[in-house]
């Protein structure tokens, strides 16, 4: 892989009153879990995971959002919807794994070199340099997460199609040959829920859960915990891990619980992680801010506002 400026410093990286704890002593119970997403199954999953412990307030129209109740609320919200909520003046305080987290993991946990930067920088890469390119966190329709034969060409095509030049991206130099991938929810350093979501090229379907592949589940959870223990991490995060054809495990990526598909994970524990990452969070290295691409789109749309 070519040396870039990114290599200079790789380490620079319904209202309820307060109730009893959600997951452990001292944990916060939200006044409500706000779900801003047009997908009905997300709302159904969050209601099931809340399990009557607090209200779940859902808005699927992507136009109006009910007024949040008094007190601290938790969120399940896509990053695009979150950008629109910020535009409306709602002070979201959400934890997310930053760009440097994955890139800073030891090589033995990733099996590849990962660099972070912004999309426009990729245009200057040498011709015919292949690599795996993906947006760091945002969902960018014109920039799919995929292996490309020429990074610079892929970047130019995405920019020509409307991607924001300052879109945060990750680039890696190895195409992973994965036979299985598992999503693992980690809370306070412990893997609390997991599910396979890709097995032998087949995507998740109902019935796949932690019990479907018990040996893999145990190994995936232990590996995710090791990754989180290797350095600073948010209190709650989602770690996707993959099993190589060689039998080794690698970290595929990391995501925010408040914007992740739970697949076949235990929904009650998923919601515990959502609450931990989105309710009453202090400002920190992990505080989410809208990616340039989604912020630009949000600026052209009516903000999500309370009725």
Role assignments for model-derived ranges:
Residues 35-36:
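Nuclease-adjacent, charged terminal/linker segments that flank catalytic cores
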């Amino acid at each position: 892989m070519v040396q870039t400026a990114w290599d200079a410093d790789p380490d620079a990286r319904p209202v309820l009153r307060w109730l009893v704890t959600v997951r452990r002593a001292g944990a916060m119970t939200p006044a409500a879990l706000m779900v801003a997403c047009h997908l009905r199954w997300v709302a159904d999953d969050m209601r099931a995971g809340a399990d009557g412990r607090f209200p779940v307030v859902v808005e699927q129209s992507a136009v109006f959002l009910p007024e949040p109740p008094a007190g601290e609320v938790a969120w399940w919200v896509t990053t695009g919807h979150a950008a629109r909520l910020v535009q409306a003046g709602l002070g979201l305080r959400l934890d997310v794994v930053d760009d440097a987290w994955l890139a800073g993991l030891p090589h033995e946990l990733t099996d590849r070199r990962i660099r972070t930067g912004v999309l426009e920088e990729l245009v200057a890469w040498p011709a015919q340099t292949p690599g795996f390119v993906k947006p760091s966190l945002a969902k960018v329709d014109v920039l799919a997460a995929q292996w490309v034969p020429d990074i610079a060409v892929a970047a130019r095509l995405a920019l020509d199609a409307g991607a924001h030049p300052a879109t945060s991206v990750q680039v890696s130099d190895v195409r992973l040959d994965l036979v299985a991938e598992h999503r693992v929810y980690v809370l306070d350093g412990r893997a609390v829920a997991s599910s396979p979501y890709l097995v032998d090229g087949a995507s998740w379907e109902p019935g796949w859960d932690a019990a479907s592949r018990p040996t893999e589940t145990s190994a995936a959870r232990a590996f995710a915990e090791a990754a989180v223990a290797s350095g600073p991490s948010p209190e709650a995060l989602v770690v996707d891990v993959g099993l190589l054809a060689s039998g080794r495990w690698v970290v595929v990526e990391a995501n925010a619980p408040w914007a992740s598909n739970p697949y076949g994970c235990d929904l009650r524990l998923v919601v515990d992680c959502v609450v931990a990452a989105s309710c009453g969070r202090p400002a920190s290295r992990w505080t989410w801010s809208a990616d340039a691409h989604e912020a630009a789109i949000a600026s052209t749309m009516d903000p999500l506002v309370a009725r």
